[in-house]
Each structure stands twice: as structure tokens, then as C-alpha cells.
């Protein structure tokens, strides 16, 4: 009777909903229920809303607390001392009696809002007892007054949902025993819990709908964005201004039209992007570092007729010539001109629409699979293509990242990566504003002395960058400039050991290396504080599938193909403008994206990149990794920059060319510094340069480097092997 009353009361107060009760019925009789631990309400919620008479495995000390005893009478309790190994054995025997038992594998209430440490012992209990695992996510209770989250806006009566996931088993290899088996089962359990967190997240919606949810959760006055103008934007202001801009652009464009955006990292750019999305226009982010011809080509590929820009930006960035040339191909619309047409009445209506957006926006016909943005690939390995990402792609990647790392309210992201780059768009911009974080926009990553000062000034806690940029900042920064940083994540190019050790020694910060591509929205994998292996790029994001295509001449690695909810909607190709080409791997078919990277995935699931498939040379019938040869040069001369490319060779098929900034570099020195390395792995020619070709994103410009090497080879003046 008490259980019925409490169920009615909790449903009334917290509007509790239970999803997946059919999974509970499928689990059988011997069941270990594993749940995330969000608040002091969790045992009560599970005891009241789960069928049957379940048992709670609970810490002996906690079970003795007076305020908890009345609630424990609702269910059976299995007290256990986590410091005593016999407690786990007793729990195994208890489960083998065909009972349904609840345990919280984190061992404590979360203080991050994300999963905390998962104890291996819980996985071992499931493994050795033969019990079915039933993962359950409690969502919403972390925002109640009964949680331990100090950085979030707490509510008296938040909406709570209990997600019951499909039952599963922990299956370990028979040859694994002892501590290794315990660790392995704990590893499997952690993956199950992480997959649960993602599977129960809501990413099948539009970005603006997710933004409205974030405002409801964190409050309309919460500061979510800021730039060099130092006029912080709250959720209310961001939504209102985005509606203002969107309504003005709506009259000039058509539904579904790709609209060019030629603007720097700023709050105004964020307003433009969201404004376009609200009214079902697609922002196409133009890379202003590639010149007028490159931008015009991108506009042709994306069938872009209108480009939004700013006179102030064009002047400050000295892009007058590029703008004049671009204006011959498309219509340039300046934000300053749009602003003059905004009347007081428009502002009043816009403010009302912003306040009531959660009502009128839901009634609109929006699809999460509609295009949300067009990003143009950097062209590091060929001609740039338009990559179309849907709302669901971007939100899925956001939720995947959140399932792995505890980014959350209170964090300040210093975002200097341009929004025309997928890293800067999804991770630096969209993830923070949808997650109650504050994104501070800085217009250029190339200001190596200024950015450390900005990190110090704004108290940045999160920073994303490439190896090139992070290495440059480390040289310029004071040891205390990055005092407030919790996490620094590197991607887009290989993190060099010198950069890793410099950050650790000078700032006490361990860089987390990740991996991805524009086509994966962009994060494919990342090292995390709890799942880290130096030299790797981390483990795959939740709900991502992968296959390795064998490559002749390469052992213990293959070409990586991936599939998942964050895989792009499709390409816009230069030879077929405006026509969407869905992802399709030649090896594995539709829905699979061929990354073109040669990788090794170890037994723990960590990815080790060997290089691009195009970054291998075939010399005398042997496959040689250009990336591996670059690493030899980096090891020999860590203070310099190096690029290795391959060019045709009449005798051996291909030859290696090293471009370096090391003044006295030559092939003999490199060979002397690399004992035991086969001669085939050394460059045939070495050219010394003042600087190497680099793209605006910080990645090496390999096509540019190859073309430069060909010109230098033709002209001579190189050190030979």
C-alpha cells in the first residue's frame, strides 16, 4: 500500500515516466540491475517504480543512516562492505539464488553530472554469478534538490525519467583469469553504462529545440556566449537575437536554401547560424583563408547565391579584394545593412517570440535529419568538398562526447578554432551552448601570444586545439596562464610527444588526444580522464561501428570505415553541384564512411593511427608510412617542423622527400639518429625551408607541400641520401 501511495506522490511531484518496462520482463529471474547514481532519490525511485520485490546492495555504513531506514523498508537490503572481498562473494551467492538485485556501480552520487568511476567489482559479480545485466538510467534527478551537483541550476520538482535498457550479459574470454578477468569485466560494464547514457539521450531533434531545452534547464539569464566585445549573451538574449536575424534573412531566401556565412568567431556569427536554422535555412560556413577563388568554388559546389558577411570584419581581416571578387559570383549581404531595417516593432515581436518559443516552435514541421550546416573540407588530401551535417548528426556527437567526458555547467570554453572547421563548429560552439557551458569566441588561432593571455583572463576551463597551435601557445605562455584549465583536447593532426611533454612539464596538464573528421561531425574517438592511453587517439564514441579493410603490405592494421548516428548526411561534390551524395563505402556499402586512415585497434579498443592510406609510399614493392618517417625526423630534431611527401621515382616507383625547418638537416644525420631503421624509411632528398605549408586550421597542407617538393626537386639544391 505504501509503495502505491509513494508511486502516486512521486508521479505527481516529479512527473516520473518509466520507459522500457518490457526489458525488465525480458531479463529473467537472476538479474543484476546497474543504475547511474544521480541523487539521494535514486533508491526510492527504483524501489517504487520497478516491479517485484527487488534487493538493494548497499554500503553497510550508508544503510545505518537514520534518515534512510524508513525507505529501505520498501525493499530488501543486502548490506555489504566494499572494503571486504568476502562481501562480493556473498553478493554473487545471493544472485545465484535467482534474485533481482540493484547496485550503483559508481559507488557514490555523481558530482559531475556524468558517469563517474565504474568499479570493476560490479562487473566481476555479474560475470561470476551468471546474472543478466539490466542497465537503467535515471534522468532528471540530478537537477533536484537531492543531488550533489553544485554547478547546475537545481529545481524543486524536475521531470524524472527512468530508462530501462535491453538486458545484456558480461562475457569474458575463458582464458582470462584472476585480476585480469576482473579488470576486463569492469571494462565491459563501463562500456555498457556509457552506451546506456548515449542510447537514452535525446538527439533526434533540431539544434534550436535542444537550445530551448538547455534554456529551460539552466535558466534564461545564464551566460552562454561571449566574445571580444565583452557583452555576454544569456540564453534569452541569444535566442531573441537569433530570431531577429533569422526573420530578416527569411525574407531574402528560400526554405532549405544554402546561405553562405563569411564571418569570424563571434556572438554575432552564432546568432546568424542559429537564425538561419530556426527558419530552415542552411548555414554554409566559408573558409576565408583559402582566398576568393576557393570561396567562389565552394559557393558553386553548394549552390550558394547569397553570402552573409560584415563590413567591419572585411575591413579588419583585410579581405576587401576577396570580397570584391566574390561579389562577382554571389550576392553579398552585410549585417550592418540588415540591422538598419530592424524596427522597434520587430524587436518587440521578436522578444515575445523568444519568450514563447517553446510553444510555437514545437508546432512547426521540423525534421532532425534536415541539413543543419554545410562545412567544406580543408582539402588536406585533395579538392575541398561540401559536407552536409544534419541536426541529428551534430546533436548525436554532442551526446556521445557527454557520455564520455564530464563537460558541463560552470565550464568556460575558449574557442579560437574557426566555425568553418568542424572542430570549432560542433565542439567549440554547439556543444557548450547546448550544455550550459560558456563559449568565449576568439577570432583567430594564430595569435600565439594573445591566446594564453585570454585563457588566463576569462578563466577558461576547456580548450580544444591542434598540435600546431598547442605547441605554439606553450612556447609563448607564462606557466600560470593556463591555471584554470581542466581539460585540453587535441585533434585534427597527430599530437607530438614534444607537445605532450611540454604541456605536462610546464603547465601540469595532460593533453587528451582525439580523432575525427568533418564527416563524423567531427569526433570519432577521444582519450578521457578515465580511459586514457598515451600515443593513441582514444576509443570509439558510443554507438559507433567500425570495420578495418585489409591493405596489402600492411600488417596488424587496416583502412578504417565507420558508421553511426554522427556520420554525415552526405557530400556536395564539385563535379555535381548541389546534389547530395550519401555516405557509401566501396568496401562495406551505404551508411559507412571510409576515413582513408590506416589504423590499429588494440585489444582494449584504443585506436592507433598509422597514417593516411594516401600517406603511404610504395618503394621497390614495400609499403612505407610517410607519417612514420615524419616521426623519425621529429625524434631527431624535435624543435623543428617536418613534412614528408612522396614523388614518382623512375627506378623504385616512388621516393621520399623531407621538407624541414631544421637548418643543418640532412639524410645522414637522420639515419644516425635512427639506429636500427631500414634504409628504405629515409628520405632520398631533404629540403630546408623557413616555414612549411599549413592550412588555416593548423593542419599540414599536404597538397601544397607535395607541389612545393616537386618544384624544389626540379630546381635541385637539396641534400641527397
Where are these regions (language model features)?
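Structural core segment of the AMP-binding/adenylate-forming
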Residues: 251, 278-350, 459, 657, ...
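AMP-binding/adenylate-forming catalytic core of the ANL superfamily
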Residues: 307, 564, 569-570, 596-681, ...
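Conserved C-terminal "lid"/linker of ANL adenylate-forming enzymes
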Residues: 331-336, 617, 645-648, 657-661, ...
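Conserved pre-ATP/AMP-binding loop-to-beta segment of ANL
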Residues: 332-335, 339-376, 383, 406-412
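Gly/Ser/Thr-rich phosphate-binding loop
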Residues: 335, 350-352, 460-465, 474-533, ...
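Conserved AMP-binding/adenylation subdomain of ANL enzymes
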Residues: 395-412, 420-462, 476
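Conserved ANL (AMP-binding/adenylate-forming) active-site segment centered on the GW(Y/F)…HTG consensus within
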Residues: 508, 532, 566-596, 613, ...
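Conserved ATP/PPi-binding loop(s) of AMP-dependent carboxylate-activating enzymes
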Residues: 539-543, 552-586, 622-624
Amino acid at each position: 500500500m505504501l509503495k502505491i501511495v509513494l508511486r502516486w506522490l512521486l508521479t505527481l511531484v516529479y512527473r516520473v515516466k518509466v520507459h522500457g518496462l518490457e526489458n525488465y520482463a525480458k531479463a529473467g529471474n537472476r538479474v543484476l540491475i546497474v543504475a547511474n547514481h544521480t541523487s539521494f532519490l535514486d533508491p526510492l525511485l527504483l524501489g517504487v517504480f520497478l516491479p517485484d520485490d527487488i534487493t538493494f546492495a548497499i554500503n553497510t555504513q550508508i544503510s545505518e543512516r537514520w534518515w534512510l531506514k524508513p525507505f529501505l523498508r520498501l525493499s530488501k537490503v543486502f548490506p555489504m562492505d566494499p572494503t571486504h572481498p568476502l562481501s562480493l562473494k556473498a553478493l554473487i551467492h545471493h544472485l545465484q539464488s535467482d534474485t533481482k538485485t540493484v547496485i550503483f556501480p559508481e559507488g557514490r552520487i555523481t558530482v559531475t553530472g556524468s558517469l563517474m568511476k565504474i568499479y570493476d567489482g560490479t562487473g566481476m559479480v555479474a560475470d561470476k554469478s551468471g546474472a543478466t545485466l539490466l542497465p537503467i538510467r535515471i534522468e532528471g534527478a540530478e537537477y533536484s534538490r537531492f543531488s550533489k551537483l553544485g554547478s547546475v541550476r537545481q529545481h524543486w520538482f524536475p521531470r524524472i525519467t527512468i530508462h530501462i535498457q535491453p538486458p545484456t550479459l558480461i562475457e569474458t574470454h575463458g582464458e582470462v583469469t584472476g585480476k585480469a578477468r576482473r579488470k576486463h569485466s569492469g571494462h565491459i560494464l563501463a562500456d555498457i553504462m556509457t552506451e546506456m547514457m548515449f542510447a537514452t539521450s535525446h538527439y533526434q531533434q533540431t539544434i534550436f529545440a535542444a537550445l530551448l531545452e538547455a534554456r529551460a534547464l539552466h535558466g534564461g539569464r545564464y551566460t552562454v556566449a561571449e566574445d571580444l566585445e565583452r557583452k555576454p549573451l544569456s540564453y534569452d538574449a541569444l535566442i531573441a537575437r537569433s530570431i531577429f536575424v533569422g526573420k530578416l534573412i527569411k525574407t531574402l531566401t528560400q526554405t532549405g536554401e544554402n546561405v553562405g556565412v563569411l564571418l569570424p568567431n563571434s556572438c554575432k556569427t552564432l546568432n546568424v547560424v542559429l537564425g538561419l536554422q530556426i527558419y530552415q535555412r542552411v548555414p554554409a560556413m566559408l573558409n576565408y583563408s583559402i582566398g576568393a577563388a576557393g570561396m567562389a568554388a565552394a559557393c558553386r559546389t553548394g549552390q550558394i547565391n547569397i553570402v552573409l558577411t560584415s563590413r567591419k570584419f572585411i575591413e579588419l581581416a583585410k579581405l576587401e579584394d576577396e570580397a570584391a571578387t566574390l561579389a562577382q559570383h554571389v550576392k553579398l549581404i552585410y549585417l550592418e545593412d540588415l540591422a538598419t531595417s530592424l524596427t522597434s516593432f520587430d524587436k518587440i515581436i521578436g522578444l515575445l517570440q523568444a519568450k514563447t518559443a517553446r510553444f510555437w516552435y514545437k508546432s512547426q514541421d521540423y525534421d532532425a535529419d534536415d541539413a543543419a550546416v554545410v562545412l567544406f573540407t580543408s582539402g588536406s588530401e585533395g579538392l575541398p568538398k561540401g559536407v552536409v551535417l544534419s541536426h541529428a548528426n551534430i546533436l548525436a556527437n554532442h551526446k556521445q562526447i557527454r557520455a564520455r567526458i564530464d563537460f558541463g555547467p560552470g565550464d568556460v570554453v575558449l574557442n579560437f578554432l574557426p566555425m568553418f572547421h568542424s572542430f570549432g563548429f560542433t565542439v567549440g560552439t554547439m556543444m557548450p551552448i547546448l550544455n550550459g557551458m560558456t563559449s568565449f569566441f576568439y577570432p583567430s588561432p594564430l595569435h600565439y601570444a594573445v591566446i594564453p593571455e585570454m585563457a588566463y583572463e576569462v578563466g577558461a576551463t576547456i580548450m580544444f586545439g591542434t598540435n600546431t597551435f598547442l605547441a605554439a601557445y606553450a612556447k609563448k605562455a607564462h606557466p600560470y596562464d593556463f591555471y584554470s584549465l581542466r581539460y585540453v583536447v587535441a585533434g585534427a593532426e597527430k599530437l607530438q610527444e614534444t607537445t605532450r611533454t611540454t604541456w605536462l612539464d610546464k603547465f601540469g596538464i595532460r593533453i587528451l588526444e582525439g580523432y575525427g573528421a568533418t564527416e563524423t561531425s567531427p569526433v570519432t574517438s577521444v582519450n578521457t580522464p578515465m580511459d586514457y592511453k598515451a600515443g593513441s587517439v582514444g576509443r570509439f564514441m558510443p554507438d559507433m561501428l567500425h570495420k578495418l579493410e585489409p591493405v596489402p603490405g600492411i600488417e596488424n592494421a587496416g583502412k578504417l570505415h565507420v558508421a553511426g548516428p554522427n556520420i554525415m548526411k552526405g557530400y556536395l561534390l564539385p563535379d555535381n553541384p548541389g546534389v547530395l551524395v550519401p555516405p557509401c563505402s566501396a568496401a562495406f556499402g551505404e551508411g559507412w564512411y571510409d576515413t582513408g586512415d590506416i589504423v590499429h585497434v588494440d585489444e582494449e579498443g584504443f585506436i592507433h593511427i598509422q597514417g593516411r592510406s594516401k600517406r603511404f609510399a610504395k618503394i621497390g614493392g614495400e609499403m612505407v608510412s610517410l607519417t612514420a618517417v615524419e616521426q623519425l625526423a621529429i625524434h631527431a630534431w624535435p624543435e623543428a617542423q617536418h613534412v614528408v611527401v612522396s614523388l614518382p621515382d623512375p627506378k623504385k616507383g616512388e621516393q621520399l622527400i623531407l621538407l624541414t625547418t631544421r637548418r643543418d638537416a640532412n639524410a645522414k644525420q637522420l639515419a644516425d639518429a635512427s639506429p636500427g631503421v631500414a634504409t628504405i624509411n629515409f628520405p632520398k632528398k631533404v629540403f630546408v625551408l623557413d616555414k612549411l605549408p599549413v592550412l588555416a586550421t593548423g593542419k599540414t597542407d599536404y597538397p601544397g607541400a607535395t607541389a612545393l617538393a616537386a618544384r624544389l626537386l626540379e630546381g635541385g639544391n637539396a641534400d641527397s641520401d
